[in-house]
C-alpha cells in the first residue's frame, strides 16, 4: 500500500516521466512518438509535458475536454508500461490508435476503423487476464468513438 501511495505523491513515473496533474483522465495512445504532434495539432493549447525514450506526452483540450496523447512504442510490453504508469497518475480512459492491415477490399488506406474485438495472441495480456477473457471494448466506448 505504501509503495502505491509513494507513486502518487507528486513523484514522476519512472518511464513516462509524468506525475499526477500532468495528464488528462482521457488519453490517446499511438505507438509512434512521431504521431503525438500530428494528433496534438487538433488540440487547443497543446503543451508537450514529457519525452523520455519512446514515451512522448502532449496535453491540451479538444472540443472543451482535457485530453492527453502519449506514445507507447512498439509492442505490448512497452504499451503495458505506459498504461500502468498512466493509470498510476490518473488516466481513466485509454484509447489505443494505430495502423493495421485490412481484410476487406472496401477498406481503404486512411479509413477510420473502430475495432469491436481483438485476438489476444501475444504474451503480455495473460499477465493481466486469463486468455479466455475477451478483448472487447465497452459498448459505451464504441458509441462515443463513433460520435467523435
Predicted regions and their residues:
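Metabolite-binding pocket within alpha/beta catalytic cores that recognizes anionic/polar moieties
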Residues: 2-144
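Conserved small/polar residues in nucleotide/adenosyl-binding loops
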Residues: 146-148
Amino acid at each position: 500500500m505504501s509503495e502505491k501511495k509513494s507513486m502518487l505523491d507528486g513523484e514522476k513515473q519512472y518511464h513516462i516521466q509524468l506525475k499526477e496533474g500532468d495528464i488528462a483522465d482521457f488519453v490517446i495512445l499511438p505507438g509512434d512518438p512521431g504521431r503525438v504532434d500530428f494528433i496534438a495539432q487538433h488540440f487547443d493549447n497543446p503543451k508537450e509535458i514529457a519525452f523520455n525514450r519512446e514515451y512522448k506526452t502532449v496535453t491540451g483540450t479538444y472540443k472543451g475536454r482535457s485530453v492527453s496523447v502519449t506514445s507507447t512504442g512498439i509492442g505490448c510490453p512497452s504499451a503495458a508500461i505506459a498504461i500502468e504508469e498512466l493509470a498510476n497518475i490518473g488516466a481513466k480512459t485509454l484509447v489505443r490508435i494505430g495502423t493495421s492491415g485490412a481484410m476487406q477490399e472496401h477498406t481503404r488506406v486512411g479509413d477510420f476503423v473502430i475495432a469491436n474485438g481483438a485476438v489476444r495472441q501475444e504474451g503480455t495480456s495473460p499477465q493481466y487476464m486469463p486468455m479466455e477473457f475477451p478483448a472487447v471494448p465497452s459498448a459505451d466506448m464504441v458509441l462515443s468513438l463513433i460520435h467523435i
